[in-house]
């Protein structure tokens, strides 16, 4: 039987059709990592159609991103970043032709998906999956050093972290991203029970589609901010009765408020527990245990034979994945787990995390973020000339 030629010139697809049944091919493709799906699109017209239909079955899994930025002026973001794709269980090297943005201050991450940088001249932030697009707006009216920042719907919120010479240490400002008027609006100030901790150093932040949640890492004192009413609501403390926590971190996974808490003390942490926090009634919080970090992974998170205290942890929760690592860059590994049926499973430390996590130069700082990455996000990244280089799993 004569074999058909595949004349794939100038990006046109060949005429040879796949011999695999359409439904079977779609099912197979739905298990592939996104980068492999992009390659599959180029095989033939039938494969391109199969990829399109397989996206209906595709379970989107959030990627973890590790960025580097200079510690001193100019605060340039490195043109290379690393991303962990949980579906392929591999790190992917990301390269851009030039730095995404030139900052005049350090960039930070908040509630997993937001990157931002604050300077006297402007406020810059990015929420797209690969953080290739940055928006620049006027700086807040109140000067701040270490505020908490969040994006809830169309509202950009900045609170606390106020300089000593300002009158209101708890000042809150809101910027309507879609209004186009370019003005910050003053809102109800942060609750006074956060007097000793009204900055991002001491607070953990999570966002739902409607509210920003803020908890004091040490005490568990918690409140929420509603951008529609511009007001705060005091919630019960995030202190599960059965556990004594010395630090906690919060995040939002789908529609669930997730809390990770450390048991023991800084020099002898004995466990990390995770709960879903249900706040349907603001006068009563319910804590549903979703899992305990295995002891071996706790040791790797802290750093094998490490003498560093584990003062606090960072929780990145997006979709059905959680990523946990120490707040200090002390060489510990990143621990990941999936949420299935409301419980944590498939615990792992990220392969090659040791090399990726520690390779930052002394003159650079590490910024960690997390995003749901879909096929459309990948295509947009290609159009923005972002290149991908898959690395080995081991």
From Swiss-Prot:
Kelch repeats lie at residues 65-111, 155-204, 206-252, 321-369. Residues 15-62 form the F-box domain. The keyword Repeat applies. Pfam families: F-box-like. CDD domains: F-box_SF (cd09917). One of its GO terms (biological process) is proteasome-mediated ubiquitin-dependent protein catabolic process. It comes from the Eukaryota. Transmembrane segments: none annotated. InterPro entries: F-box-like_dom_sf, F-box/kelch-repeat_ARATH, F-box_dom, Kelch-typ_b-propeller. One of its GO terms (cellular component) is cytoplasm. Keywords: Kelch repeat, Repeat. This is F-box/kelch-repeat protein At1g23390. It comes from Arabidopsis thaliana.
